[in-house]
Every structure is written in C-alpha cells, then in structure tokens.
Design a protein with these regions (language model features):
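Formylglycine-dependent sulfatase
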Residues: 13, 17, 24-269
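Bacterial N-terminal signal peptides that target proteins for export
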Residues: 1-12, 20-22
Length: 269
C-alpha cells in the first residue's frame, strides 16, 4: 500500500475510534462500509459550483460541504486510460504499463475491486472503462457490469448513418456480457443502471462497492435538451493561454505545440 495512503487511512480510523464510545467500537469494527466511487471524465478541477459561482452542481456541492475536499490533489497522468489504470491498481503509469489511450494492454494487472470481492463485497461497474483498448467485456472483480466500447456515445444514434438509424440500429451497451441497445442520454442511462443495481440487484445483507464511471463531460460534450441553454447567460472567461497564438508558442518545440491539438497526447509522435 502507498505509505501516504496508509498513514491517512490510519489517522482517519484513529479519529473515528477515539471519538466512539467503547461499546460502539466493536460494532464499528465489525460492519464494513459501503463504497460508492463516481468518476467524471474530463471535468476541469474548478468547474463545480462550490468553486466557481454561476455553475450549478448541487449534488457535488453537497458532498463538498459534508465531506472532505482535497484542493491539492493531482492525477498521475493527464491522459484518460493511464489515469484510470492508476485508480484501479494504485500504481504509477510506468509500473502498470497503460501509457496511452489506444494501444496499451491491461493484461496481467490486478484491480482493487478484486480484493474487495474476495473480502465479501458485492461489486458493480457501470460506465466507461476505456483503459488502453476499446473492449467492453466484463472485467475481473465485478459481480455486475455495464459498459460500452471505447469512448461510447452520448445519444443512442450518435455516429450512425441515417439509413442505419432508419433501420433501427442503435449504439450498444454491454450488460453482464450481453449486448443491449442504448435507449437514452448516456448519463441518465448509466445512473439508472446504477440505481437499479443498488435498489434491486444486490444482496442487502452484504456490503457493496459501486464504481460509477460517467462518459460526460468528455469532449465533444453534448448536453441533454433540458440543459442546452442552462448557461446561455453566463459569462465564461477563457484563459489567455488557451489561444493558439505566436506569444503562447514562443520558445516551445514543435512537439509541444502539436500537443495543443492532440486528443490523446501522442498523436504526433
């Protein structure tokens, strides 16, 4: 285990136990905690209501008010797949080997939900996996599985030709190894699958771990119709460094300049 993580966890447990009555400690130690882990894709660090006035994220704001916020947290990589692999393995990119979004392999890696499952937890994964390849097949360590290939689609007909849509074709989800047509906006649908499992698909006598991995707000972001005009009147100021100008490029080698137009960080190597 990461020494820092171990120290933080030990300190947290110590605070809880120190403040608990003696009679309650045995019960506290005996009952495992349920865990819900929510991952949002490509969300800027400050695009939450409690950090930026005008943004409407009431549920995230509630968690910030009633939980712990880590203002100095960083990811091990600014790329999608390497970051996901680090979350699931606790390893740095050079150790787990998932170094890009398209050509890496997760073969031989072990994920922490496997250990939770061995410890008696019911485990569920719902959402975007995308860890170096496009497969949506169920992965080890999960009792319940809902995913899609690669980046997935915001809407069921995204990426399909008009004649395909007319013929009834839809983007597909993998639900416990079976192909199921996507029915609606992906954020809503993934949330519905997660809630269905929490309320009806598990054994309520056992602890659970739910990993809800949303596609949104990955570029090119497409909001559902009900939110299309939500920020129409909000004045959003873009950072000066965002512009692809001579001033921003001055003194930078070409490979650095090219990364400004890169989807996966290595498109020009």
């Amino acid at each position: 285990m990461n020494p820092m993580l171990h120290a933080v966890r030990a300190a947290a447990v110590a605070v809880v136990l120190a403040s608990a009555p003696l009679g309650a400690r045995a019960a506290t130690e005996a009952k495992p905690y349920n865990i819900v882990f929510v991952l949002v894709d490509d969300l800027r660090f400050d695009t939450m209501g409690f950090l930026t006035p005008g943004l409407q994220t009431p549920n995230i704001d509630f968690l910030a008010r009633n939980g712990v916020y880590f203002p100095n947290a960083v990811v091990c990589s600014s790329l999608c797949s390497p970051s996901r692999a680090t979350i699931l393995t606790g390893m740095t990119t050079r150790n787990h080997g998932v170094v890009d979004n398209n050509n890496s392999s997760e073969k031989g890696l072990e994920f922490f939900p496997q250990y939770l499952r061995e410890a008696g937890y019911q485990t569920a994964f719902v959402g975007k996996w995308h860890m170096g390849e496009a497969s949506d097949a169920p992965r080890p360590g999960f009792d319940y599985w809902v995913s899609f290939r690669g980046q997935g689609s915001y809407f069921p007909t995204d990426g399909l030709l008009p004649q395909q849509v007319a013929a009834g074709a839809r983007q597909m989800l993998n639900v416990n190894g079976q192909e199921v047509p996507q029915k609606g906006y992906i954020t809503d649908e993934l949330t519905d699958y997660a809630m269905q499992w929490l309320e009806h698909g598990r054994d309520a006598t056992k602890p659970f771990f739910l990993y809800l991995s949303h596609k949104a707000v990955h570029s090119e972001a497409k909001p559902p119709q009900r939110y299309e005009l939500q920020y129409a009147d909000l004045d959003i100021k873009l950072p000066a460094s965002m512009a692809n100008t001579e001033e921003n490029n001055r003194g930078k080698p070409m490979w650095v300049r090219n990364q400004r137009n890169s989807w996966h960080g290595a498109d020009f190597f």
